[in-house]
Every structure is written in structure tokens, then in C-alpha cells.
Amino acid sequence: MPLAFSDISCCDSYESPVERIVAELNIGESQNIKLSNGDIVHLTLLEITDIRDSLRNAVRAANIKISVDGEEISLNSGNYNLPVTVGKVQIDCPVFKNYYINAPYDVAWELLKDARFRVWPKGSSYIKPGSFVYPIKQAWFAGKSQSGNEPAYVNTAEYPLSNKLYYHSFHDIGGTEGMDEIVSATEGLVISANNEILDGYDSISTHVGWIDIKSPDAVYIIDNRGWLAGYLHLNSIDPAIKPGVKVRMGQKIGNIGMQGSAGGWVHLHFLLCTKDFSSGRWVAEDAYAYLWESYIRQFKPHLMAVARPHQLVWTGQEVILDGRKSVSLAGDIISCKWTFTDGTTAEGAIQKKIYSKPGEYSEILKVTDSIGNVDYDFSVIQVYDREHPENPVPSMHAAYYPTINIR
């Protein structure tokens, strides 16, 4: 049976459960999963293989073989991958057990078996239309980001002499200090804001992993699904946002900042958790698919270029740049062009590159579709000197404002 991940709300009432059903499996285990539309799908977890780097032994990708109603497919995990359609379902794998090997910050996952899967009916929304908006007034991928268990890397957070990994289970969106406006992704009840907690909710901090919801730079809201959304590192919080207040979807929360444990770079740390009904603890919910879908609904882009996640390599080591996660919503992608920091260019979604000098590189991907739409993204490559791994590489988070409605 699928795990009992609750949609129970701490508010007076709650909406119908979202489309996705969560299930955990061990290798070799099979389950019949009842979808939100009543259909039954048979899942069997066959094999898990991770792909790790040679510097920190960090998980960078995965090959998770699963049978869906007898059809075998391979899934990646997190790292800017959207759910995959197979048979009558859409399915993804937000986390698997191999992350625990060298990750001290593991409590947010609350993983009980070898891998966790989310399953939606084929063609359904990832999250109920009209119940979730993009939480920042900013263009998609305008700056650096950390998402889907990507190892934290901004401001030299990746260091080859340290194998203590912080896999970023929530979603960071980089921006410009005090400028980008943060809005509530959902309707809901403010349970914590500006270092104050609503009476009766003090115990939540002990059930949200290592996160303390009492913070001067953060706002926490429980929505009508019973999900917990957190907005952290804020430069300022709107005076109307106070514990006990019910907020509207899209209502201003505050402005982006680098306060608290931001690590020295300006970003929104967007936290999304659901409650595990069996343990009472809050579990990290990978928000990438919901952010992707809500951004498309609001801003209606024709093309979405994706060059992420970042990579960490030694000098002289080959890097594979991959733009195949890019999606055209209006036509077919006909061109992927890379522009490299050494001034060279290359055509094709997949490119190989070797760096002889240590440093941080930002390689630009330009994607064009058959309608003539163009979109850009960039891939950050951090390169360390193999002979002197103790030397940190310089890092910079470049940001600009505004990022939308530019003429």
C-alpha cells in the first residue's frame, strides 16, 4: 500500500487531495497504487544506480529502473527533471536511499524505503489549477538556483576536501537584494512570521527536520491542503503578514534577501512540506514540478530553456553539458547553441568540454523552436585544481532587476 502522506490541514477546512499519490518501495518490491482518478497501477522497483562525482562522492544523477504495469523505464531523480509519462501515469522519483550515505542533513526526506515515487494520472496537472502560483515576481531561471537534491554550491558551498554533503531538498531562487517581490504561492494561514509563532504551533519546529520556524527573516504558511510553505532569508516582511492572518494566493509576503542562514547570497529559500500521517513529521516535497507548471500558467512562455544542474569537476576532466531538459510549448525545438566563456560556440543539445584552469564558469545555452521563439539558460561549472584541491575557486552570484516586462 502507498504511504499515508496526509493532506490534513491545520486550518478549519481543507481541499480535496492533490493529484499526486506518494509511494515508497524497496528494490524488488511491488505495489498496486490507486491513483487519484481511481485507476490502479502496478509498480515494481527493479534497480537503483547512482552517478557520483570524483571530487566529493556526491550523487549527481541516478538511473532508477521501475516497471509500470509491466513496462520498464528508467528515471532520474530530482535535479530539474519533470515527471515522465508512461502508460496511464506520470511518475517521478524525488529521493532515493543513496543520498543518505554522506548527507548529514537527511531528516527532511523522512525516507522509509529505498525510493520514493510520486504518481499522477496521465495528462493531469501536477498540482490543482488555481491553488498554486509562482512565489516570486521574476523571470524563470533569472539567476542561480539550487533544487531537487542538487548539492548546494553557490558561493563555493562545494568544496572537494569536504564529503559532508548538503543536498538541497527544497528550492532556492536567486535574485536582487530587496528588489524581487515574494508572494504567497497558496492561500493559507500564517503560523509564523517575523520571529513570532501562532499559539498552538510551537511544536511544528521539532517535526520539520532541522528547520526552526521561528525566525526574523522567514514566513511559514499552512495552506488549504495542509501543506507547509516556507519563505526564508527575506530582506523585509510585509506588515500585513502576521501569525494568525489568512493570506490570499499571490499576496505579497515581502522582498528577497540574504538574511539568516542564506550563506551570503541573495535568494528565496522556498520550502514545501507535506505531513506524514503515520509519524506526524513533515516531509520535504520536491516543488520543482509545481513551480514549473505554475510559472507556465501565469507567464505563458513559449519556450523554456534548461541547462541545469551545475557541475563540479577537476581540471582536465571532461564535462558533458546537456540542454535536453528544455521544452517548447509552442512548436518543436530546432536548435540548441552553446556559448562558452572561452569565446567558442557549439551547436547541439549535448556538448563535451574540458577546462584546464580552475574557476567558476557560466556556459550559456540558447534554445530556438520552430516558431522562432528563443530562450536562454546557463550551466555553472565549478572547476578545482586537481593538484591543489585546498584552493577554493572564486564564485559570484550575478543578479539583475527587473527581469520581467523588459522592453
PLM features per residue range, with description:
Residues R116-D217, M249, M258, A262, ...:
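Surface-exposed, glycine-biased beta-strand/turn segments
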Residues G28, I40, V59-A61, L112, ...:
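Extracytoplasmic
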Residues T44-L46, L189, G230:
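Residues located in well-ordered beta-strands
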Residues A287-R407:
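Extracellular/lumenal mature domains of secreted and surface-exposed proteins
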Residues E47-T49, G175, S192, H233-S236, ...:
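A residue-level detector for short acidic-glycine micro-motifs
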Residues F5-W140:
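Surface-exposed, beta-sheet-biased, low-hydrophobicity segments with strongly acidic/polar composition
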Residues G175-S184, D217, I222-G250:
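Short histidine-centered loop motifs in beta-beta connectors
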